[in-house]
């Protein structure tokens, strides 16, 4: 299982939100590129970037920062989400050196777009499913749909999606642990690998994900915990690498 540091971009700075509320943000750095350097030097093997302004505006806003990070680390897998709603945007990021794009809102509102994107950019498409009480939320979490996460995930199985990033909104940024039972259920209900996100606080939460014994859970995204120092990236990755269960 990979430990994947999150860099959330708002107005060019690296921030963390609580439960997806733009008005409840903490700025951790005004230099996201050096923040990326910190996590890479700490031994991370993948980065998770989110264009928060893009998620709300429906198009990339912090694209220059994303490109700068991708150019600095050409061999590092980088996934970007937020405002990805056209094939042109995906092409822009792929050309910039980003390895994976995360389709969120558009995957819920136009699931056929996912199939189209997978066909155009095989192996590069991740679907981001953000949920509240098991139902999918969209538009920067401002809207909650009547669509159930597991039902939607199954729909993407035939499309060639490389992973699903599953975020439990109630847990995100709260440092109270992630929703292990639901993450496990999702990983077992679909053949698509799952990356857990939201609420990871410390090594105990990483252990809880590993203890779930769901091979489909391939990664854990962590944000506030690594910024506030309750989780160390290198230590957590070593723990995953050496886990015997």
Curated annotation (Swiss-Prot):
Main location: cytoplasm
Enzyme Commission number(s) of this protein: 5.3.1.16
Reaction it catalyzes: 1-(5-phospho-beta-D-ribosyl)-5-[(5-phospho-beta-D-ribosylamino)methylideneamino]imidazole-4-carboxamide = 5-[(5-phospho-1-deoxy-D-ribulos-1-ylimino)methylamino]-1-(5-phospho-beta-D-ribosyl)imidazole-4-carboxamide
UniProt GO molecular function: 1-(5-phosphoribosyl)-5-[(5-phosphoribosylamino)methylideneamino]imidazole-4-carboxamide isomerase activity
GO cellular component term, pick one: cytoplasm
Pathway as given in its UniProt record: Amino-acid biosynthesis; L-histidine biosynthesis; L-histidine from 5-phospho-alpha-D-ribose 1-diphosphate: step 4/9
Pfam families for this protein: His_biosynth
Keyword Cytoplasm: yes
Keywords of this entry: Amino-acid biosynthesis, Cytoplasm, Histidine biosynthesis, Isomerase
Keyword field contains Ubl conjugation: no
Record-annotated active site: 8, 130
Subcellular location: Cytoplasm
Disulfide bonds: none
Any one of the GO BP annotations: L-histidine biosynthetic process
Entries under NCBIfam families matching the protein: 1-(5-phosphoribosyl)-5-[(5-phosphoribosylamino)methylideneamino]imidazole-4-carboxamide isomerase (TIGR00007)
Family: Belongs to the HisA/HisF family.
Name assigned to this protein: 1-(5-phosphoribosyl)-5-[(5-phosphoribosylamino)methylideneamino] imidazole-4-carboxamide isomerase
Organism this protein belongs to: Pseudomonas entomophila (strain L48)
Designated gene of the protein: hisA
